[in-house]
Each structure stands twice: as C-alpha cells, then as structure tokens.
Amino acid sequence: MKEKIPFYNEKEFHYMMKKTKKGTFSGWYIINPENNSVEFSGSFNRQFKLNKPVIPVNTEYVTRKEFNEYKDSNDQRLTKIENKVDKLEIKVDKLEKKVDKLEVKVDKLVETVNAQGEDLNNFKVEVRGTLQSQGETLQLILQTLQGMSKRLDSVEGRLDSMDGRLDSMETRLDKIDPLK
C-alpha cells in the first residue's frame, strides 16, 4: 500500500527548496510504509534531480556525529555495567569463599555435636547402670530393714511377754512376801 502525499503546504515546499538550494519540484512523493522508502512522481528540473532531498518518513534520521555520540555513550554505559559486573563477580567469589569456610566450620560443629551426643548417650548408659545398681542396693537395704523390723517386732513381742511375766512374778512376790 502506497500513500500519495501532495505538496499542499507551502512551508513543506520551502523546506524542500532549502534542502536542494536550487530547482523546482511539482508533483507527488510516495511513501512505502513496508520498507520506509520514498518514491517521487511528477516533474523535476535537472538541478532538483541532482540534489535529491532527504524526505523524512515515519522514522527519524540521525547524523553520523549523533550516531557516534550515541554509540560512545552506549559504550560508556556498557563499560560501567561491565565494571559493575566484574565487581559483583569479585564479591560473589569472596562470598563463595566465606561460604566454603563456613561449611567447614559447620562440618566441624556437626562432628563436635555428634561426639557430644555419643558422650551423652554413654553418660546416660553409665547413669542408668549406676542408678540400677543403686536401686538394687537400696532394694537390698530395704529388704534388710524389713527383716530387722520383723526381728524387732518379734523381740518387742518377747519383751512384752517378758514384761507380762515380770508383772505376774512381782504380783506373786507381793503375795508371798506380805508387807514386812
């Protein structure tokens, strides 16, 4: 699809004349939006044909100087970005080294915790053994005390019976030996 645009505007015509400096143009220029090309139709004089103007299409045109400035600024930005990336890579390397050191420390701590866990388990076994032996000893002491308690009860019973006998003997003696 080509679009024909006439030079209705006087300002546009004078702009074209400034570009070419000399010459006249009457006719149309055609813009092809597919490839942003411009075609002319109409009559040109010889001088105008030699100094073909650049007609702006829907895109912007830049000069070589502007392009180089833009390119230089992009190069500078790219250099800054590359420097930042390099610095970040160095920081990442340092952090990786720190992480490696911390991993070694964590491994040592894990070994220490495992060793302490084993010591604790051994201590628990020893304490259980000690408690069991103490419990057995206490059971034996309890049995001994119960046996002694039974003996004391029997001795007490004997003493009570002896006390009763003594009382009866005293009463007999009192009866035999009346008041002197």
Swiss-Prot record:
The record's section on InterPro entries has: DUF16
The superkingdom of the source organism is Bacteria
Report the Gene3D superfamilies cross-referenced here.
Answer: 1.20.5.110, 1.20.5.170
Hey, which family's this protein in? Belongs to the UPF0134 family.
This protein is called: UPF0134 protein MPN_368
Native species: Mycoplasma pneumoniae (strain ATCC 29342 / M129 / Subtype 1) (Mycoplasmoides pneumoniae)
